[in-house]
Amino acid sequence: MNHIYKLKSYGIGTDRRFYGVANKTLETPDFLDPVRESFDWFLHVGIPEAFDRIFPIVSANGKLEISFRRGSLRVEKPENEYLAIREAKIKGKTYSARVYVTLVKVHSEDGEMEEQEILLAEFPFMTQGGTFIINGFEKVVVSQLIRSPGVCFRENVRNQQADDLFNKVEIIPQLGSWMEIFHKVTGNQVDTVKFRIDKHKNIPLLSFLRAIGFTNETVRKYFGNSPELLESIRRHKLESLEENLELIYRIVRKDDRITEEGLKNLIPSIIFNERRYNLASTGRFMLNAKLNLVERISQTYLAEDLVSKKNKILFKKGTYITRQLALEIQEKFNNEEIPLSEIEGVDSTIYARQLEITRNENLWKRFYVAIVKVWPNKKSMLQESEPVNVIATDPNLNEKTLVLSDIIAIVSYYFNLLSNLGKSDDPDSLVNKRIVSVGELLQNQFLIALTKIEKNSKEKISTKSDLSQLTVKSIINNKPIYNQFKNFFNSSKLSQFMDQINPLGEMASKRKVTSLGPGGLNRDTAQFEVRDVHTTHYGRICPVETPEGQNIGLILNFSVFSRINQYGFIITPYYQVKNRIVDYSKVHWLAASEEFDKSFAQSGVEIDQNNRIIPDKLTVRKNQTYLVLDAEQVNYIDVSSMQMTSISASAIPFLENNDANRALMGSNMQRQAVPLIKSEAPLVATGIEEAVARFSATNLRASISGKVTYVDAKKIIIDDGEKPEIHYLRYFEKSNQETLILQKPTVKVGDKVKKGQLICDGPSTDNGELALGKNVLVAFSTWYGYNYEDAIIISEKLVKDDVFTSIHIQEQTIKFRSTKAGNDILTAEIPNASAKSRLHLDANGIVIVGSEVDTGDILVGRTSPKGEDNPTAEEKLMAAIWGKKALAQKDTSLRVKNGEGGTVIDVQILSRDQGDNLEEGVGMLIKILIAQKRKIKVGDKMAGRHGNKGVVSVILPVEDMPFLEDGTPVDIVLNPQGVPSRMNIGQVLELHLGMVAKKLKTKFVTPVFDGIKIETIKKLFDEANIPESGKFKLFDGISGQAFENPVSVGYMYMLKLLHMVDDKMHARSIGPYSLTTQQPLGGKSQNGGQRFGEMETWALESFGATSVLSELLTYKSDNIQGRNLLYNNIISGGKIPSPGTPESFNVLAYELRGLLIKLEVHKNDQENQEVEEIKDPLELPEIPSNFIDEYNQDGRIELNKLEEFADFDEENIDFDKLTR
């Protein structure tokens, strides 16, 4: 019996059965395009924009000007990207490009001009894969999600200190001071409205309005008579402009002396100066969008006629304004059909001051606003009560700073909210958040550096008396740019070491979005609301993929189809629907703000051949809720069922059947799957695997169309008839996480290829599809308790057949230095080294490539001069004359570290003689790469794709594994108790479908939210002759008896994760101690011990294990003398000493002494068994002298001063003496 399906082709000739509903889905875009486009923007728009902001640089006396010649920018990058990147990785360099620019120097006195092209900067250049190579390591610049510049109105916001609620508006620039207007809405009294600049003290709003030229009459005229405003006017006593300016000056510039010039420039410099206050294009767009009329006049009644320029009544008084009508009215203001009103009654002194600073003549035109008088409701219209003024800003503004009409519109909106006009904003919505991507982050760094260059240049010019001698090159120093970029890439939180375990991890790290970093949130203070999933995330940010732990909800991932528009807002695609007909010809990209009042249907809606929606009623998304509407009311439809999720989450089959918490774990763990020796694509896929493989940077695509003329393990040559193109393959390269990067050709000589076609399989790729794990036969059953608590039982077959074997590459380096005592020598003649350890060295003393080395074997032979022989000049002379024997040498060879044995695959030698750039005092550096084959073993972590993770607890012989009726032994036994409470049913469905796939010798594709339904799986059971329950009779391999009940058995896709026991296993015999506590350090990297804490001590106490406890808390912990004595006695074979006082007890003793508490120490004398009382409280067991010094540095009491207080009289204490 055959259920209806389509056969879809994926990768290189893999056909999969598709049972979904979705009719047409949008082709997945190149996932790395946003990153590349952003860097491209930086090169072609960002850099020239930065130049325009800083240049021309004019000297203080105005005699010299340096300007930038437009269009002269030239970026010079390395010719062959592959070879340049390879060299950068081997030699630890940065893959960078040079920026040349032509600057013009003009001497105003004689009009002399000098033009010169200079090398302005050398900065890291992005690779094709969207990464940067910094000092030989691949790094990624992560996009940042921050509050968008603009204006944000909020009602009833809780104050964190008190329990009061506030109304407030925040004015957020991209550069400059944040401003806030707010008042308290709780309490019995009406509160006055306040204004705040940055985090300074509150200023009455009236003071600010007065300072920019308003009078009380103008304030009432424009902003109405709300109780809060009248109370603010009543309480405000400062009348003149100067008094109000002085008040603001004292708060904002509290340490500066007040001058007349300072008062005049105060507000223009804070708000109106483009160099200090910049909204950027995004801020201006947001301001114009928020401060228009539409939101406030919708669903109100006109309180006056709206008249056109020609005195024609366009809208009559009393008209009810729908949203559609509000849009029409706004449009007429935009087109100036309805004239704007001039701002009257405002003293423009301060504003005129701004014109002097910016010399922007357009600003005189900015004295206009759009004013509409309305009644908020029908009752107020019928009573003809006083109408409310709704003031909108000039709709044609494009200034990057605030202007007067903005300020009036903001204050008007604030008071309109008290009349229930307008709506408050949600700061967590993507309407009010924007993405700062790579290009913009780099432009910000470039701007900071150019500002430093401007400052330095002005200083340089001012110190020179003869300006004619100065050249452009001598004035402009490019060091600040180099330092700024170096700083950013090496130490910024946004420049991260790339996750390179597998192609999925690499892709995810390039599409990561963080709310942390400069200008972002702080993980310690971020509230729950900020971390939560928001309705506007749909199609833009994945609701599933985020880290567990303190970064949850702060680090996110872009959804599959999301992109970023020119303002930095995330946009997502839809198909438009008109009268039930879906228009597939054009894709509409919408930002969150454009979704208001529109209804969106899912992609899985049934559609006929004429693209008409079949069902009459549909569940749709509209204004942040789900509604059931008629099909005619649908405006848009999703382009794909994967639209909501990120790449990792879209790779989980049956995601819709899993609990979100487990899906989150599944997404994160897929990124940790290590590439296996033989990759295998899943039997049950979701369809995104092909796209990941195609766009991954670890796979190669043909750069031209043509014929393959040459193929080997390291390169592929394609000829298009004009010029052969060489494609270099990556061969046995080490990734950032020490996994293997190896590309295998998938084309043969003679094949014809198209541009963009995959020509090789990289790590974790199988025939052009992502392949992170293996399809293995899994049974859900318990087995003698070995899979208790998520443990996993695996068959020895998986070890023998190298099913889960991976290759890992370790790098070991050694430096050869030149010191006063002499030079390090590379040699095969190593003193006191055994022949076995030198077995693999060549004549020069370097290990031979291909050698199998083990722990302790010598990789590079090196001898260094012994430190104590530091010869004087006379001794050197004597040695030269008499030819004394060479100075004593010691063995400092590079040996294989513990647990890092394997096959030597490469030796890289960097030498100063060959022109390599090495650090000071180093003449040569040798890197050895060792490849290790790791089979799966007990203690390794494994997982499925559904968040079902566990640790291998036992590897059973094949004959002991449970087997099916036909004798097939299962590969893995999982605990059935891991399913119900975790609610990740997807793994069970995958198991059954995997069994069907194996029986029918086919493969399935089941995209997220458009997957195979359970009814279909049941019908497929019939087709594959599988019992209806999907369960099989299973037999115990040891007893041969059948299990009591049938067991679910099928094929599941299992991954081996990077958390391997080889990297975790660790034991300490001797090792370092902490300087402060004198206890052993912790962790494998420090060769530390396992902390035996308070609860562990209780456990031993309860068994009365006194001797074990005694040595744990003394010798093995912090009894300094005891452990040294013990070590000596063990070596010399003496008697084990009795445990002494631990150091922590001494700390307690000092603490008590500092509190002047008398201590008595009773010593147990072995000879006469007498107890001796120590009269002097200072006569405690011996304490090391350095310990006292250390504690004194802590500001504790100096012990020698304590003797003065041995017989103290409480009334005559000089307490000052007790402190340092």
Swiss-Prot record:
Enzyme class: transferase
GO molecular function per UniProt: DNA binding; DNA-directed RNA polymerase activity; ribonucleoside binding
Highest taxon above the source species: Bacteria
Keywords: DNA-directed RNA polymerase, Nucleotidyltransferase, Transcription, Transferase
Alphabetical list of InterPro entries matching this protein: DNA-dir_RNA_pol_bsu_ext_1_sf, DNA-dir_RNA_pol_bsu_external_1, DNA-dir_RNA_pol_su2, DNA-dir_RNAP_su2_dom, DNA-dir_RNAP_su2_hyb_sf, RNA_pol_bsu_bac, RNA_pol_bsu_CS, RNA_pol_bsu_protrusion
GO cellular component terms, A-Z: DNA-directed RNA polymerase complex
GO biological process: DNA-templated transcription
EC assignment: 2.7.7.6
Membrane found in the keyword field: no
Signal sequence extent: none
Reaction(s) the record says it catalyses: RNA(n) + a ribonucleoside 5'-triphosphate = RNA(n+1) + diphosphate
Subunit note: The RNAP catalytic core consists of 2 alpha, 1 beta, 1 beta' and 1 omega subunit. When a sigma factor is associated with the core the holoenzyme is formed, which can initiate transcription.
Protein task: DNA-dependent RNA polymerase catalyzes the transcription of DNA into RNA using the four ribonucleoside triphosphates as substrates.
Family according to the record: Belongs to the RNA polymerase beta chain family.
Protein's UniProt name: DNA-directed RNA polymerase subunit beta
Species of origin: Mesomycoplasma hyopneumoniae (strain 7448)
Gene: rpoB
